[in-house]
Amino acid sequence: TLEEEYPVSGFGRGLKLKAKRVKGDGTVSRVTRSPGEVLLEYNSIAGAARGIGAALAKIECKESTPFKTLGIMLDVSRNMVMTVDHLKMWFRRLALSGYNMIMLYTEDTYELPDEPFFGHLRGAYTLEEIRELDEYAKCLGIELVGCIQTLGHLEQIIKWGGAYDKVRDTASVLLVDEPKTYALIEKMIAFWSEALGSRRIHIGMDETHDLGRGRFLDKFGYESGFELFNRHLGKVNELCKKAGLAPMIWSDMYFRLSNADQNYYDL
């Protein structure tokens, strides 16, 4: 996999790379150079990849981390998406830096069955493309995790009028308690459950400042954003459990909604 871009080969005539697996918590990577040879000691694929990065840079290192996960979120929701090949390039370089987890932030940039306007004109990834990326990431010791939106930041689909009017609260927020909302979210979750081997998923839900202030207010009257948020999260959590996934969310709205001025801090 690294051979696609870097001078690493099982049949090369350069320095001999000897690899030795060792025990250790977190990620362990040690590189020692001697004439004609590089010794790489590692405890995981991520540690080995970081060691190869050090070897390619012609440096020695002795490193370990106090944590098990070193991750990054790649935003593929701005304009058109990165191509699969370009993402693979990112994966290779992140592997050489010791990363073992990548989140793909996709608001609407993936295809859903019977949802032609979801990802329309945005270069949405197919199920097969995400599976291909997942297999590639595994070869590099990287866990690929879906990072989606299940409440706010969905203006790119809500803008398609008639297609998503029934699930619209505001211009970017989905309508809580609407059955069609949860039917759509279930499709989102099913896509990532089927596409990736990881049993983790990030379900977003950040920056929903106008939650309950649009069509929800017109239909049902005022209800506190905190109550709406909690109720919606509970329903989405059940959908994740049904798909065998462990969800995580951004934390900002719990700070904001529990503050009288919707700020992060009381000053």
Where are these regions (language model features)?
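Feature activates predominantly on carbohydrate-active enzymes
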Residues: S34-M248
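Acidic, contiguous N-terminal accessory segments
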Residues: T1-E63, I249-L267
